[in-house]
Structure formats: structure tokens, C-alpha cells
Amino acid sequence: KRLIPVTDILALAAADLVIEAASERLEVKKALFAQRAEFCPPQTLLTTNTSSISITAIAAEIKNPERVAGLHFFNPAPVMKLLEVVSGLATAAEVVEQLCELTLSWGKQPVRCHSTPGFIVNRVARPYYSEAWRALEEQVAAPEVIDAALRDGAGFPMGPLELTDLIGQ
């Protein structure tokens, strides 16, 4: 009810929190954050839903980089409780604390981490995705069987092939 999707970036000027979910390209994100930093008040928290791009790099050239952090949601976002709260080198500790409190109020389970390739989950889970694709290439099983095995046998909410197809990897 309190989330308002916008297509006009100027509509964000009054927001307390902005969550960017643009394509996974550093230059796109840097341009969006530079725009936001110009017209959002200094207390507005600027976050990105990136799954792997450096928070430090995104915040490097903007005003008040201490207010920039990552909020990495997992697919399917309405179902998955885990949410990585990612800090860059300039991110203020109080910003991370505010974001953790906020995400708890959304019914999410925040985990704090520093900006590093893949953060926590993707860094550790990438071998699952790679091995699923390798198994498919080697014709170990059909794609739907591989996905079902990981969903049903390992408790994955989505199979690794299904997920990488959804997120475009």
C-alpha cells in the first residue's frame, strides 16, 4: 500500500526510501543514482536491488554516498523472506540499521553484508547454477527434472535453471 512504483524519476523527490531495480549495468545504475542524488533530499535512502554490482562503485560519484546501500531481494520476492542489506565503503552504519529495521517491518529477514561480488547468497549458490547447466549440457536429465530435483530434494523455491532463466543469467 505504501510502495509507489514510478516511471518519472522526478516523482522520487519526496521519497524517504528509493529502491532502484534497473538492468544490471553499472553505467545505468550510476546515472540513475547521480540523478536521484541531485533532487532527493540528503536524508532519502538510496538503494539498489542489484545482485552483484558493487555498491561502492554505484555510490562513488554522488552527493552523500553514505546513504547508498543494496537491498537484494530474492526470487520469487513475495515468497522469499531473506533480504541482503549490502553496505558499500561509504555506507553509514545507521543507514544499514534503518534498512534492517524497515525490512523486518516488511516481514523480511535481513542479513547484513559488505559489497563483494555476489554478496552472500549468489556467491555461495553460483556453483549450483553452473552445475545445473553442466548437467543439462551433459544430458544428465531434462531441465524440468533438474529443477524439480533441487526444488523437492534441496528445498529450493525455484529450480536453478528456472531461476537463471528468470533473472537472465
Regions found by a protein language model. Name each.
Residues 64, 85-116, 126-158:
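Internal alpha-helical scaffold of NAD(P)-dependent oxidoreductase catalytic cores
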Residues 1-16, 25-27, 31:
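Conserved N-terminal Rossmann-fold NAD(P) cofactor-binding segment
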Residues 25-102:
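Rossmann-fold NAD(P)-binding glycine/threonine-rich loop
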Residues 7, 48-50, 114:
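Short loop/edge segments at beta-strand edges and connector loops
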Residues 161-162:
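Short, charge-rich amphipathic alpha-helical segments embedded
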Residues 1, 165-169:
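Short, intrinsically disordered, charge-balanced linker/junction segments flanking boundaries
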Residues 19-20, 48:
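Redox-cofactor binding/interface segments in oxidoreductases and associated redox assembly factors
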Residues 4, 19, 69-71, 111:
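Hydrophobic/aromatic beta-strand patches that form the interior of the parallel beta-sheet core
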